[in-house]
Amino acid sequence: MEDFSLDGNHGHVPVMRDRMAALIAENVEALGENAVIVDATLGAGGHAEFFLNTFPKARLIGLDRDQNALRDARARLAPFGERFIGVQTRFDGLREVLESVEGDIIDLAREHGIAGALFDLGVSSMQLDQVERGFAYRTDAPLDMRMDATQGITAADILNTYSHGDIARILKTYGDERFAGKIASAVLKEREKEPFTTSARLVELLYDAIPAATRRTGGHPAKRTFQALRVEVNNELDSLKNVLPQITDALNVGGRAVFMSYQSHEDKLVKKFFTDLTTSKTPPGLPVDLPGTAPQFKQVTRGAETASEAEIEENPRAAPVKVRAIERIANNSGDLS
């Protein structure tokens, strides 16, 4: 979830805001007052506010595990009154929200399905700006990194308790860190002297562990390790795996789900799921789809879309975003309505 450029009193304009609205516009506008949008990564509420302004008849369900973000978003979206409901949960709590939470908007979603959904993955600019959260590596801060600060393990817990093998695996898998084993060895050696508590000590360790030639060409040496720790702390990949079938099940015919990924491992998961879901199950060689084997979804984006050069120039945080969208074209019985 990456933001860029200033937006009045609310911090940042969301990445690719206009394109996100355009991707869900047709079905949302067609459903009118029956349209329910899900912003599953509500953050500061920038995308949600734009959607509610752009589609004045639509309702919106906003999800966020971060209680501070949810508080601020509720205040920002208060002028929309009963057109908005915010729920504190991880985004893979979507199914439980639709099944268990009471409210007129939830009832509407149960009856008509979801018209459009947005998943803006990763950490938000708001969270990066809150130094005490420990997401940023350029300022010394507690090694926390929890998106929900009320529960779960911290980055310090991982560094101080995980085995060499587990630390190396996390850094390699979630951060594409070439020197994962060397860094893991250095962590175990350092924690014998004193437990890790703040980010500056970890950054210093990474400067020492990563060769100078790599530091000169590979960006900030802490970037990949901090990313990997954040993904592990917040169980981000499992949440993504869990929510993909939840949202596609919840879409109505014509409904679209849009995913904005900032890391390769996220985009690969989304790409594979979309490919599987849009591929016919009819055995190869047959001229037509057998009953019950035709795909119920189609991919809306051709490959992954990216931010424009102008947007990237205004804020480099938009540079890595990859956008993929999928649309339900038939219901579970194969009907087109």
Swiss-Prot record:
GO terms for cellular component: cytoplasm. S-adenosyl-L-methionine binds at G45, G46, H47, D64, F91, D120, Q127. Pfam families: Methyltransf_5. It catalyses: cytidine(1402) in 16S rRNA + S-adenosyl-L-methionine = N(4)-methylcytidine(1402) in 16S rRNA + S-adenosyl-L-homocysteine + H(+). Keywords: Cytoplasm, Methyltransferase, rRNA processing, S-adenosyl-L-methionine, Transferase. GO terms for molecular function: rRNA (cytosine-N4-)-methyltransferase activity. The gene is rsmH. HAMAP family: 16SrRNA_methyltr_H (MF_01007). InterPro entries: RsmH, SAM-dep_MeTrfase_MraW_recog, SAM-dependent_MTases_sf. One of its GO terms (biological process) is rRNA base methylation. It is found in: Cytoplasm. Belongs to the methyltransferase superfamily. RsmH family. This is Ribosomal RNA small subunit methyltransferase H. Specifically methylates the N4 position of cytidine in position 1402 (C1402) of 16S rRNA. Its EC number is 2.1.1.199. It comes from Corynebacterium glutamicum (strain R).
